[in-house]
Swiss-Prot record:
Family: Belongs to the decorin-binding protein family.
Keyword terms, alphabetized: Plasmid, Signal
InterPro entries membership: Decorin-bd, Decorin-Binding, Decorin-db_sf
Pfam families per the UniProt record, alphabetical: Decorin_bind
Chain's role: Binds to decorin which may mediate the adherence of B.burgdorferi to collagen fibers in skin and other tissues.
Protein name as it appears in the record: Decorin-binding protein B
Leader peptide range in chain numbering: 1-20
């Protein structure tokens, strides 16, 4: 009888310890991700400030036009966009790592919180002229709520794919020479 009671106490204590460790891990993960998100947003603001110093007039951006056709400092603007994309990629990698850690034990609230951090970061990209990304990601999430690691990773992949397209448009690899692929020949 005493051994059964002792076993019950040991099991209860073990369970409480396991829950406490799990909660501590989740809190540390959230704090680390929030800190990383804040750092990235600060880096994006720094990138914008540096580009402004190189002659980019971000105030010239219109609702849909955020390229060198509406502002000065074309190469500096394209470099700023690429720098912001590279830094965002690092943050998205951290999100992926944490999502995979929580894949089995995480709950929908945790994945949604991580998604919200991704949206905040994507929104901060608008400061350097990368617009419309948040709206596209939100539209997709309406059909597939972000409540699992798989859906969070799918949203992350969508962001990465769209950022890849923006990065390729900047054409930095070719010495900054911007080519216009549209043919203006008329027959």
């Amino acid at each position: 009888m005493k051994i059964g009671k002792l076993n019950s106490i040991v099991i209860a204590l073990f369970f409480k310890l396991l829950v406490a460790c799990s909660i501590g891990l989740v809190e540390r993960t959230n704090a680390a991700l929030e800190s990383s998100s804040k750092d990235l947003k600060n880096k994006i603001l720094k990138i914008k400030k540096e580009a402004t110093g190189k002659g980019v007039l971000f105030e010239a951006f219109t609702g849909l036009k955020t390229g060198s056709k509406v502002t000065s400092g074309g190469l500096a603007l394209r470099e700023a966009k690429v720098q912001a994309i590279v830094e965002t990629g690092k943050f998205l990698k951290i999100i992926e790592e944490e999502a995979l850690k929580l894949k089995e034990t995480g709950n929908s609230g945790q994945f949604l919180a991580m998604f919200d951090l991704m949206l905040e970061v994507v929104e901060s990209l608008e400061d350097v002229g990368i617009i419309g990304l948040k709206a596209r990601v939100l539209e997709e999430s309406k059909n597939n709520p972000i409540n699992t690691a798989e859906r969070l990773l799918a949203a992350k992949a969508q962001i990465e794919n769209q950022l890849k397209v923006v990065k390729e448009k900047q054409n930095i690899e070719n010495g900054g020479e911007k080519k216009n692929n549209k043919s203006k020949k008329k027959k």
